[in-house]
């Protein structure tokens, strides 16, 4: 029994520290302005940084979900069309659910890696891997 406890303690010591942290993850809110027939997301790069994702990847998802064209300009994103901040934040929540949160442990400590031609969501907390749909 003592040997089992020693092995268990050794295994626990080898786990990454993220496993034991219990901080709450909040989905960042996007702040947008509508000017003419374009929508400007003012804090887009900050949102992407908070999600620990490439801004181009987040933008590509948003553009596909909203069915529009757009681009990055500095720290903001410009979308062709009029979109409310409510709709944009709703689509960001969809992005977080599909491309940020681990499907096993529900933590945001993930990275998108590429193995061969497949994109994989790898969790830094539990080590789980899950294939992702390509954008």
UniProtKB/Swiss-Prot annotation:
Gene encoding it? eif2b
> Assembly and partners?
Heterotrimer composed of an alpha, a beta and a gamma chain.
* Keyword annotations: Initiation factor, Protein biosynthesis
Question: Which PANTHER family would you find in this protein's record?
Answer: EUKARYOTIC TRANSLATION INITIATION FACTOR (PTHR23001), EUKARYOTIC TRANSLATION INITIATION FACTOR 2 SUBUNIT 2 (PTHR23001:SF3)
Molecular function as annotated in GO: translation initiation factor activity
What does the UniProt function comment say about this protein? Answer: eIF-2 functions in the early steps of protein synthesis by forming a ternary complex with GTP and initiator tRNA.
Q: Which family does it belong to?
A: Belongs to the eIF-2-beta/eIF-5 family.
Record SUPFAM superfamilies? Translation initiation factor 2 beta, aIF2beta, N-terminal domain, Zinc-binding domain of translation initiation factor 2 beta
In its UniProt entry, what is this protein called?
A: Translation initiation factor 2 subunit beta
* InterPro entries for this protein: IF2/IF5 (IPR045196), TIF2_bsu_arc (IPR004458), Transl_init_fac_IF2/IF5_dom (IPR002735), Transl_init_fac_IF2/IF5_N (IPR016189), Transl_init_fac_IF2/IF5_Zn-bd (IPR016190)
Pfam families named among the record's database cross-references: eIF-5_eIF-2B
Q: Which organism is this protein's natural source? A: Methanobrevibacter smithii (strain ATCC 35061 / DSM 861 / OCM 144 / PS)
């Amino acid at each position: 029994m003592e040997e089992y406890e020693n092995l268990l303690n050794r295994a626990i010591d080898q786990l990454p520290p993220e496993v034991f942290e219990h901080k709450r993850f909040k989905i960042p809110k996007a702040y947008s302005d509508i000017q003419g027939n374009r929508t400007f997301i003012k804090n887009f790069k900050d949102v992407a940084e908070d999600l620990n994702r490439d801004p181009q990847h987040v933008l590509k998802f948003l553009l596909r979900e909203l069915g529009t064209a757009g681009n990055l300009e500095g720290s903001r994103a410009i979308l062709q069309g009029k979109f409310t901040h409510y709709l944009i934040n709703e689509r960001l929540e969809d992005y977080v659910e599909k491309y940020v949160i681990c499907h096993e442990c529900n933590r945001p400590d993930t990275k998108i890696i590429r193995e061969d031609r497949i994109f994989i969501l790898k969790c830094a907390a539990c080590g789980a891997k899950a294939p992702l749909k390509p954008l």
